[in-house]
């Protein structure tokens, strides 16, 4: 089982988009039994009285535009923001962040990354000008289409890496 946690600042835009994009891809490829996929925030800004906010409506719209959310596995209607924890570092194989600040804040919360689990999602791009870059935050840019494009590229790159390293076939 490959356990992937996507991380962004608030867990209402980039990281849930990545969570449900990867779920959609692995479901279409028949790989759901090989993965556990979730997402979390580095901040608690989207968590009120212990309850996280849902996926931001424009992020939901972008996912729906691409047919994501129609199956039980990809249904994001019950997804609520949550903050990353120390336990997440022990539990997940990959903690994939949207930007460098997310990496810094994840390590601040979880402790040193001695196992090399905390990375940028776009680190998995192969030979691309976007490799190792941040995924722009659509909360500020309004460009949910660009975020979606980067997330899909990162998820495809991750799957290619997992195939190359023999983790999936």
Please place each PLM-identified region on the residue numbering.
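Conserved active-site segments centered on acidic
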Residues: 1-91, 160-169
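Phosphate-binding/catalytic loops
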Residues: 88-89, 94, 100-169
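Helix N-cap/beta->alpha junction signal
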Residues: 15, 99-100
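A structural signal for well-ordered alpha-helical scaffolds and beta->alpha junctions
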Residues: 52-56, 99, 155
